[in-house]
């Protein structure tokens, strides 16, 4: 008994065969039912283990995400702290460099003042030495002239009188 339901598409005939024995539908349903019955535990166990593994992987991934997020936050915080520390060190270095430069300038000015003072002292000492040398030379010249002129001006009586006065002044 062949029952067909014609279904026409684009001038071609198409028919469905509803004969259960001819289409082997009972055998197919029976095989599928037996497979489901016998393999349900096996496939169910495999699927359950697979589901648990996937859930464990998801949980592990979530934990790693949380850990990575915390590590990222900590890293960002440490980076910000490192930047702050670096800026602080840079500011301190600039301040120290300015202080060193100012100290160097101050020392240079002090050294220049000391050198100038030493030069002035040397100049004054040299001027005093030259003045003293000129005085000594002038005195020597005056004494030489006086000694040269003295014998012409002094006679024996004046010489004796000069010697006596000198002795009285000493004595």
Curated annotation (Swiss-Prot):
What are the protein's GO molecular function terms?
proton-transporting ATP synthase activity, rotational mechanism
Location of this chain's protein in the cell: Cellular thylakoid membrane
Self-association and partners? F-type ATPases have 2 components, F(1) - the catalytic core - and F(0) - the membrane proton channel. F(1) has five subunits: alpha(3), beta(3), gamma(1), delta(1), epsilon(1). F(0) has four main subunits: a(1), b(1), b'(1) and c(10-14). The alpha and beta chains form an alternating ring which encloses part of the gamma chain. F(1) is attached to F(0) by a central stalk formed by the gamma and epsilon chains, while a peripheral stalk is formed by the delta, b and b' chains.
Q: Which organism is it from?
A: Synechococcus sp. (strain RCC307)
Main function:
F(1)F(0) ATP synthase produces ATP from ADP in the presence of a proton or sodium gradient. F-type ATPases consist of two structural domains, F(1) containing the extramembraneous catalytic core and F(0) containing the membrane proton channel, linked together by a central stalk and a peripheral stalk. During catalysis, ATP synthesis in the catalytic domain of F(1) is coupled via a rotary mechanism of the central stalk subunits to proton translocation. Component of the F(0) channel, it forms part of the peripheral stalk, linking F(1) to F(0).
* GO CC, alphabetical: plasma membrane-derived thylakoid membrane; proton-transporting ATP synthase complex
Q: Keywords assigned by UniProt?
A: ATP synthesis, CF(0), Hydrogen ion transport, Ion transport, Membrane, Thylakoid, Transmembrane, Transmembrane helix, Transport
- Name the protein family: Belongs to the ATPase B chain family.
PANTHER family xrefs: ATP SYNTHASE SUBUNIT B, CHLOROPLASTIC
| Gene3D superfamilies, per the entry | F1F0 ATP synthase subunit B, membrane domain (1.20.5.620)
Residue ranges spanning the membrane: these are 26-46
Q: Which InterPro entries match?
A: ATP_synth_B-like_membr_sf (IPR028987), ATP_synth_b/b'su_bac/chlpt (IPR002146), ATP_synth_F0_bsu_bac (IPR005864)
Cited NCBIfam families: ATP_synt_b, PRK07352.1
Q: Does the entry feature the keyword Thylakoid, yes or no?
A: yes
Show which residues constitute the signal peptide.
none
Q: What is this protein called?
A: ATP synthase subunit b
Per the record, membrane topology reads: Single-pass membrane protein
